[in-house]
Amino acid sequence: MAPVVTGKFGERPPPKRLTREAMRNYLKERGDQTVLILHAKVAQKSYGNEKRFFCPPPCVYLMGSGWKKKKEQMERDGCSEQESQPCAFIGIGNSDQEMQQLNLEGKNYCTAKTLYISDSDKRKHFMLSVKMFYGNSDDIGVFLSKRIKVISKPSKKKQSLKNADLCIASGTKVALFNRLRSQTVSTRYLHVEGGNFHASSQQWGAFYIHLLDDDESEGEEFTVRDGYIHYGQTVKLVCSVTGMALPRLIIRKVDKQTALLDADDPVSQLHKCAFYLKDTERMYLCLSQERIIQFQATPCPKEPNKEMINDGASWTIISTDKAEYTFYEGMGPVLAPVTPVPVVESLQLNGGGDVAMLELTGQNFTPNLRVWFGDVEAETMYRCGESMLCVVPDISAFREGWRWVRQPVQVPVTLVRNDGIIYSTSLTFTYTPEPGPRPHCSAAGAILRANSSQVPPNESNTNSEGSYTNVSTNSTSVTSSTATVVS
């Protein structure tokens, strides 16, 4: 009997579309794989033969339970431990400079300590490029950082807000590092680990820097102000990962080994600054090897506007950014790279007639993506790489037999590729109840008729009459746990 030919030699099987059952399993388990790229917002250019390595060094984290599950699955399928190990290379997106291998073996993060950009590279901005694959050569994809601005050197002039891209705004993230005697090997970074602040030589923390009113009292809750950070102002440093916070601080400009008490210009990238612990007797945030301590400054007898500090109390400040990419193989391993990973930045609801439309704005959208509400696939229309539209499903898709919304129903919004890759968005859509459908229109019309309304990036609300309401996500009150600094 002749063999049955099922396809051309070397032909790849067609991609498996995601099933409702597979989506339900994903929503229950949430075994995501996440790639985090943490980096500074600016990079100092290197001239001639010098190599000014990026500081703090870009860092790649592999987060989520999916990495371990993927490794276990590959080893069950016959891969060796080495073949199931993720591998990564990082570069500055320039073919003239070789990509550098990141050592991820045995841990979920790695830093790229020897990246630099030379003066022969004329770009004013660039993005880091992280290429990832498994040890058996299966491709994961190429992940890009956020945009990084190239600067020649830190500005020594009195900064003005005309150069706003070099200034530091309240509520943004910064890294702080200390370098004794300008030696790269002595660099230590402010970091939180095990519930304590410490000075790490290996990992750096990203801290929200919040501007406070001068009369704001110490407490776990505090009211923050908008605007750019100026020297002499009261600030709060809050770890972006743990929520741990330092006591209220006054940020002061550093000149050589002195803190200037009367400086009031805007804080700029890569400036050296000191942090005075408010309402103390000249105590400053300081490091002593790995410990974070308080250091008491000495008054300058001839210059009352200055206080003498030691090297450990002088910190270099720089703004940081984060690129985050999350994916899950909903129908098992795929042949194509998971990148580009779509990122949703905002939602806008548009309604009319019996149909409510949701517009998604973001990056890396492709025609092979569909929007899902919970375990329901929505009719999706691709516009361009930054915009997609979808039809909001009827409430009956989630609650069988319901003709109108009886109680609030919240469903997650995800994007799904045509080969079963699920991209989590952290967005939810909420159906809000009403007494019942209007007598003069159909149930679907009562549920879905909508007025246009802007929806914040993390939640969308609708009631069954179709009037959509905004949900405020911006709060000026920040809660944190205050860490005590050792004296």
UniProtKB/Swiss-Prot annotation:
It is found in: Nucleus; Cytoplasm. The keyword Phosphoprotein does not apply. Residues 452-487 are annotated as: Disordered. One of its GO terms (biological process) is Notch signaling pathway. It comes from the Eukaryota. Residues 342-432 form the IPT/TIG domain. CDD domains: IPT_RBP-Jkappa. Residues 44-54, 152-157, 179-184 are annotated as: DNA-binding. It holds the Pfam family BTD. Keywords: Acetylation, Activator, Cytoplasm, DNA-binding, Notch signaling pathway, Nucleus, Repeat, Repressor, Transcription, Transcription regulation. Residues 469-487 have a biased composition (Low complexity). Residues 452-468 have a biased composition (Polar residues). Interacts with activated NOTCH1, NOTCH2 or NOTCH3. Interacts with MINT/SHARP. This interaction may mediate the recruitment of large corepressor complexes containing proteins such as HDAC1, HDAC2, NCOR2, SAP30, FHL1/KYOT2 and CIR1. Interacts with EP300, MAML1 and PTF1A. Interacts with RITA1, leading to nuclear export, prevent the interaction between RBPJ and NICD product and subsequent down-regulation of the Notch signaling pathway. Interacts with SNW1. Interacts with CHCHD2 and CXXC5. Interacts with BEND6 (via BEN domain). Interacts with NKAPL. Interacts with ZMIZ1. Interacts with RBM15. Belongs to the Su(H) family. This is Recombining binding protein suppressor of hairless.
